Each structure stands twice: as C-alpha cells, then as structure tokens.
From Swiss-Prot:
Record keywords, A-Z: ATP-binding, Developmental protein, Kinase, Nucleotide-binding, Phosphoprotein, Segmentation polarity protein, Serine/threonine-protein kinase, Transferase
EC number(s) on file: 2.7.11.1
Keyword Transmembrane: no
Residues reported to bind ATP: 10-18, 33
Residues bearing the modification Phosphoserine: 422, 429
Lineage: superkingdom: Eukaryota
Record gene name: fu
GO biological process terms on file: germarium-derived egg chamber formation; intraciliary transport; negative regulation of BMP signaling pathway; negative regulation of smoothened signaling pathway; positive regulation of nucleocytoplasmic transport; positive regulation of protein ubiquitination; segment polarity determination; smoothened signaling pathway
One GO MF term: protein homodimerization activity
Protein name, per record: Serine/threonine-protein kinase fused
Amino acid sequence: MNRYAVSSLVGQGSFGCVYKATRKDDSKVVAIKVISKRGRATKELKNLRRECDIQARLKHPHVIEMIESFESKTDLFVVTEFALMDLHRYLSYNGAMGEEPARRVTGHLVSALYYLHSNRILHRDLKPQNVLLDKNMHAKLCDFGLARNMTLGTHVLTSIKGTPLYMAPELLAEQPYDHHADMWSLGCIAYESMAGQPPFCASSILHLVKMIKHEDVKWPSTLTSECRSFLQGLLEKDPGLRISWTQLLCHPFVEGRIFIAETQAEAAKESPFTNPEAKVKSSKQSDPEVGDLDEALAALDFGESRQENLTTSRDSINAIAPSDVEHLETDVEDNMQRVVVPFADLSYRDLSGVRAMPMVHQPVINSHTCFVSGNSNMILNHMNDNFDFQASLRGGGVAAKPIVAPTVRQSRSKDLEKRKLSQNLDNFSVRLGHSVDHEAQRKATEIATQEKHNQENKPPAEAISYANSQPPQQQPQQLKHSMHSTNEEKLSSDNTPPCLLPGWDSCDESQSPPIENDEWLAFLNRSVQELLDGELDSLKQHNLVSIIVAPLRNSKAIPRVLKSVAQLLSLPFVLVDPVLIVDLELIRNVYVDVKLVPNLMYACKLLLSHKQLSDSAASAPLTTGSLSRTLRSIPELTVEELETACSLYELVCHLVHLQQQFLTQFCDAVAILAASDLFLNFLTHDFRQSDSDAASVRLAGCMLALMGCVLRELPENAELVERIVFNPRLNFVSLLQSRHHLLRQRSCQLLRLLARFSLRGVQRIWNGELRFALQQLSEHHSYPALRGEAAQTLDEISHFTFFVT
C-alpha cells in the first residue's frame, strides 16, 4: 500500500470496500478493493488468490482492468483502473437515456459479456451498479469472477442477493442455469437504460419474484421495432428460447457497435457458451494467453464434482465515485476494429423463428391462478403494472425516439430512486443509502472513542474495533460470508442454482468470528442506561444500530446477549417521554434500514437450531441433505433460551403491527429463511398440558398474531400462512383446546381470517372435531372475549356449504 495514496472511500458492499487512490510513481488514479480475510477458510483464500490471477489475465477495453493484487495479514487488496460513475447513479441523476446513447452503451456491454463468455466466465451479477462509465460514456463491466463469495454450505440469502431485479427466471424458479442467465440480466439493464426503470419493480421481494417468474414485460411505446425485438430476445423467460450469441452479434440493434478482438474469435469457437457446437477440449487453446487463462481456470480447486471450467459472480460492491473525480480516458470506440463474428453463417437474419417473436402483450394465466400472488386459495383483482396495457399494444411498431423534457426527466429520476429496491439486501445487511454517510461515521468514531476513555470496562473489542475499521455496511459481514452457494454447485454440469423458497442459510461456525460475550453484555448494559437517561442519539444513527444488531448474526452469541439486544432495541417503545415521540419515527426508520426484523428472526433460528458441524465438516462438499439444519423442540430448550426467543419475537411482533415496511420485511424473511419450520416447531407443541412454559405460550401467541397480521394487511402473501396452518403436522384443534386463553383467542381470529382469504384451505381441514371445538368455546367458555371471538368465527364459517360436513 505504500505505493498508493488513498484519497477517499467511493464504494462498499458485501465483499469489502472500494477506495479511490493515486499511484505515487505516475499519479495514475486507481480503485483499490479491500477484501477482509476474516472468517475465511484456507481453501477459500487459496481460490480467491487464483481468481485474482485469472482476472489479471483478462484484457478487454470494456472490462475493468485489474492492475495488481497483494495482501496483508488481515486483508486482500485488488487494484483496478478507476471509472467515473456507474450506470445506476447516472440513471438516477439523468433519467432514461435516448435510444441512441443506450444502443451505444449496450454495444459496449455486449462486447464485454461476449469476451467473458468466450473465456467461459459467467458474471451472474449483472446490474447497473456493476456497469461503470467514463466521461465519454464508455461502459466497462466490473465485479465478476473475483467477486464470487467462496463460502460453502449456503443457499437461500445468496440467491436473492441485493435484489432479484436483474435475476433470470430460471434462477428464481430453481432451475439449472447457464450463460443465458447473463443474457436476461443484460436485457434488464438495456431496458432500464431506455425505460428509466427495470422491467419488473415491486416493494416486496416475494412480489417481485412472482412478477419475474409469471408476468409479461410491459413495453414502452417509445421503443423502435429494432430495439423491442432486441429486448424481447433477451427477456424471453424460457432460457431455451432466449436469443443466442450467434443471433445477438448480428442483431441490427447492436450491429456495428461491438468490439471483438481478432484473437478472441478462436477462443469463442471453443467456448460452449458462445458456440453451441463446441466440445470441451483438454488441450490448450492455440493462442498462448488464452491457453494460460484456461490453465489457470483448470487449476481452481472446486471439488471432485467439477465438470466445467467457469467462474461466476455474486458480488454487490457498488464502486460509486463522487462527482468530483477526475475524468478517465478510455477512447476505444474510435479505433474499433472490424467485427469478426465466429460461425456467422448462422446469421440472425436467417432464423425466421426469432424474427417471429410475438409483439403482443399476452399474460399467461389460467382460471385457478391468482395474478398477484399465485395462490389458488385467493381471489384478488388484477393489478396494473408500470406501463399502460393499451399503450403497449398500440406502440408495438412505433419507431419514434423518446423526447423527455428536463423536468420530466428529473421527476422520473426521483421516481426511479423511490421504486428501486435496496441493492444491498445482502443477507439483511445495513443499507446506508446510495452515498457514504461520512458525518455518521465521524460521530460513531467520536462516540466510540469517548466511551473508551470514560469507561473502565471498554465496549466489546469485536464490535468497536471492527466497526471503526470498516464502513457500517460491512458490520454484517459474518452473515454475508456464509450466504453463497457452494463452489461445487457452480461448477457442476447442470449448474443447479441455489434453492430459493424455502431454504436454510447454513451459517457454519467458521463464518461467526469469536465474540466476547461478557464485554458485549457490559456494553449493552451501559447502552441501556444511556437510553434510560434520555440519550437516544445512538438509536438514530444507522452505523451505531448496526453495531448493536451485529450479535444477532453470530452463532457464538449466548442467549443473554441476544436477549439484551432485543431489550435495548425495545426500550424506545416503552419509555414514556413527550420528547421521545418526536424521535420515535427516526428510530423506526433506522430499524427498517438495518433490516432489524429479519435479523431478529435469523437470530432466533440460529438460537433454536442444533449446533452446526465442525469447521472441517462445514468446509467439505455438501449434499442436499446436509443443507437443512434441524430445529430443537420446546422440551429440548432451556428456560433461558425460551425467554430469549420470546423477547426476540415479541419485538418482531410489535414492529410488524407498527409499520407495514416491517411487515413486508417479515414476509420476505419467512420465505427466505424458511421460518415456517420454526413456526411449526412451536405451534405443534401440545399446549393442552398444564406444564407449558409461560415463555413458550407467549412465543406461540406472537406467531399466531403475526400470521393474522399478514392475512389482514398483505393477503397476497397468504400462501406463507397456508404453508404453516395447513401443514399435516399441525393439528389446529389442539390450539383451540389449549389451556391458555391467549392461544385459543388468537387461533379463533386466525381461523376467521383464513376463511376470508384462504377459503379452500379451510375447507380442506374442516371437520366435525374442529366445528365442535369452536362451538364449545362459543357456548360454554367463561372468558367473554374468547367466547365472542369463537361465536363470530362460527357465524362467518356457517355461511359456507362445507360447514355441516
């Protein structure tokens, strides 16, 4: 690092931080990516170093060049060329591009992606944040290969990394994937460049996944026929029907705008991604550099199941430069060579099947499918999308270029920012917005320093030192390291994608760094005292709350630490202070941004699951059966563990009923974390016994209340509740016959809501025993509120024909 002078932090993500720096020898401006070695196995670091060597060999005018890489005891440093701005920020500032500028940028991306695929490298994290631009609007791809997180034994949270805005349907549908997944993402980026927003937008991850899998793209009427044909080929949901490289390179939309080096043509013929007739060859490529690259790829140790040499990407580092950075010169387009398209005899123009792509919006649904939720037990109105349906029909062949007034463009830019999901959901990481909050960082450092000097018992070293050495967004790095699928899976012949819904994010012990539980308890106790004294500033700052939340992602945190975190974060809602009412909204917004609800749920599942395998076992190749972690039942838990789980879910329950953003995060987390298993584990307990622990009753009551809230406020997510309530393991009658008023009353409420939103499911479980249990509660119970609830439930269900069965 002595050769470089670091000037500023320009980006941060799941893998590390990106700094702008100047090389002292020649004053060249570079970007330095710092990747922490913390929590990484030796095998992971070995593969990471080899990937650096691979990237150093990649040379293309539209691929960010790696200058060098080196490492210290704690970090790996990757030095690359520096770019002015990314496409996401450009679109945020300027709105949608015209078709000509977008065509130019798309040509650059096609050139770069073709180069990667020619070298058997999949990107699989294509999005505007990974497209960097210089002052001349020359685009360069970044964050591939090296960016892949090497952690083993993880599936779920990796799959919906950042957001699935640009993920191909086959990935979301848990189908095998190949290079066609990159083609879909390329189409999403090109679409967003011209439309101002991605093809599919939603405020909920679950809703977004359903849209990508089932809804058709809405085409703006401003697109020319060439442009629409190009996008239709890329945004074909069936990867087998998606446009091929042969067709893409000859498409009139990008014809004449693609750069292919002469030496690349031979490599493209040998790559199965770019040439469908290519066979895997054991010999080196004819070109020496390509041969060296293939040799390096083959040397990667990915396990015995490897059958393909490819590299995939899963990074989300946003190398966003500030507006005052120097301009870079990458004038390549002016000196572009003649494009040589390999196997061009299979021209796009000769394929009538592609030319006959449907130009009409035709949603594919049947009479038993809910358009919004895909839930056959619900009937919901058809929801309109971003573009007018009739306008899309009328504008199928219009060739007019979009003319956007500056005011409209600015409005669209703001709307784009609002509509897009946080690009750093990354395993429930901290989202600090689109820029680095330097003031918040400064305050965090000052507070930590003052705390150190004023207290004899210093705060936890793990929390404070790590927080000061990395941006706040890096605090949840332990979880992020574990949220990626196995290398063996990525390199298998079928390329089986990570499991989406449901799944378990198996965070093995190696991904949870040692934690000083006693120091954490002292730190949390001091923080509680500060809140009781009226000092609320710490809970209004993202980075400080992220420090407090960090133990929730660490499997080595003891129950007392987790319970103290929940109690500390609950205090603002129970303190009676007129001034607090003003601050409460700020605190709630911070809780939303740091994804507190999913973190609490994740902590509870870590707490209640059986301990993970040893580090050596966790590093071994995983089978399907080893991916799921079993949960302990109520009799297997200690009183302290039950009390802790209850504290976690009581806070979740309060937040979910407080604000819909928390409810949306809860629904996403239930699906992503497969929390239905945890719910079933508790609700299947026999609460008819008199020895049921009070904490277990409160916890089960929270779960029933949460499911009722989902049905009331977000009925389109009723399927999440159905998976739990209608599971054969759950006997709903036993809940109605519980010895506890709370469980009986909330069970009646839940059943009434299910009859409204999941009637077919209620009909399946309805029987005489269930009807008798409700009648007993409505006629003979001494508790008036419960008796009234049961009577109301019976009254509503009695109107249906299956009631008497």
